Each structure stands twice: as C-alpha cells, then as structure tokens.
C-alpha cells in the first residue's frame, strides 16, 4: 500500500482513466457498423484502433490528435475493406469532446481536490481537452497535452515536461502520484521516471487491452476504479 500523505499532486491520464473513451468510440461507430460490418466484434475494432493510432503517434508525434484520429479511421476502413467516407473520418476526429466520463469520475475528482492539487497528462490536443474539462467539473492546477509536449505518451518527454512544471511550483517528483488506466501509456513510462503509479484497471472484467496496446508494467498500486481509490484514501487518512 502506498502512503497517500506524502503526495501533493495527483496527475491523471484522462482518456481511459477519467473519460470512458471506449464507450465514446463505440457509441459513435455502432450506427456506421450496422451498415458496414454488423458482425464485427467491438473488441477487434478497439484493438485495431489501438495499433493504428499508436502508429501515427509514433511516426508523426507533432500531429494534432484530431488528425491522428482522422488518419486512424482511414486505416481502419482500409483494414476491414470499407469504402472511404470523409464524413465518418471528420466525425471521428471531432468526437473527443463528447466522450463521457466514467460514472465515478466527477465524484472522485471532487473528493481528491479537497486533499491534493490535480493535474492531467493527456495524449490529445488543447482544443479537445478544453471540451472535456467542462465535463469533469473540477479545476486542474496543470494540464499537459501531446500538443504542448509535441509528442505522445509513452514518450518520456511529456512526463518530463509535466514534472518540470510541477517542480517550478515547488512540487518534487517524489510528491507526484500518477494515475492511469494504460500500462503502455502511463504506468511503464511513469515507473521509468521514478514516479509512484496507480493502475486503474478499468477493463478488469473484460478480455484484451481494449483501445490501448498491451504492455507489461508493475504499478505500485492497482485498483479497478477511481471509487476504489477514494475508499483506500479515506481508510488511510481517517
């Protein structure tokens, strides 16, 4: 068990941890699939998304996230033999701000903001994150996006930028608790940099790694929800 009292800031991954991006993606695409490929399992679609998105983020690290999504959708169409549809690509690229928070997100953030500064480290652009912040309903001390860092997680550069900015606020690396759903994007790079990490295993009751690449990494703490993390914190501080 980690000692919660030693931290001053909680840094969160956003999409997959705070925001249910898999639901946002599948809800948008399901009406299209009804015509294109009604028997395609959502698990296969999400794993294809993970692979193709990662390719563009690695090859074109300065590409803004809507453009990553637009190109990812084009590759998905090609992979499954669907006819190219620019309208679908544009809708997919512009959908980020409508992806919903998990049911426990807002209440958990409201609880944690009473105890810590909050920050977001996210693989999106600033405009998309700005829309999402309205759904989260709490203030964040710091947000660092792929657009800010000109690279995508799991690149250490995005983490290093956030760490440097927090150090300028008087917060040391040892006082940062990083929380994320993706071992690939968050837990593995966080551990490499010496951060204390919490893995929110949102997919604990599902097969596969969903919309992220599978990676082996050992977090300091594993929970299945933010609500569980809140409960652990309450038990330790009261």
Residue spans of the language-model regions?
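N-terminal helical cap/lid subdomain that shapes the substrate entry/recognition surface
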Residues: 2-103, 110, 114, 127
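Asp-based, Mg2+/Mn2+-dependent phosphohydrolase catalytic module
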Residues: 1-10, 43, 106, 110, ...
């Amino acid at each position: 068990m980690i000692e919660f009292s030693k931290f001053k800031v909680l840094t969160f991954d956003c999409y997959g941890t705070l925001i249910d991006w898999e639901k946002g993606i599948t809800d948008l695409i399901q009406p299209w699939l009804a015509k294109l490929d009604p028997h395609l399992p959502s698990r296969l679609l999400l794993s294809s998304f993970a692979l193709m998105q990662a390719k563009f983020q690695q090859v074109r690290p300065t590409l803004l996230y809507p453009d990553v999504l637009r190109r990812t959708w084009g590759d998905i169409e090609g992979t499954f033999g669907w006819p190219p549809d620019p309208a679908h690509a544009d809708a997919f690229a512009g959908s980020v701000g409508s992806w919903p928070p998990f049911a426990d997100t807002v209440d958990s953030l409201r609880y944690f903001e009473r105890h810590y500064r909050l920050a977001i480290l996210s693989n999106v652009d600033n405009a998309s994150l700005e829309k999402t912040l309205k759904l989260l309903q709490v203030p964040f001390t710091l947000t660092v996006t792929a657009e800010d860092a000109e690279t995508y997680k799991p690149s250490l550069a995005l983490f290093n930028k956030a760490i440097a900015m927090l150090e300028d606020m008087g917060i040391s690396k040892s006082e940062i608790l990083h929380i994320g759903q993706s071992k690939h994007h968050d837990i593995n790079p966080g551990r490499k940099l010496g951060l204390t990490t919490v893995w929110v295993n949102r997919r604990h009751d599902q097969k596969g790694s969903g919309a992220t690449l599978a990676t082996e990494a050992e977090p300091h703490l594993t929970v299945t929800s933010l609500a569980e993390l809140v409960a652990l914190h309450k038990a330790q501080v009261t």
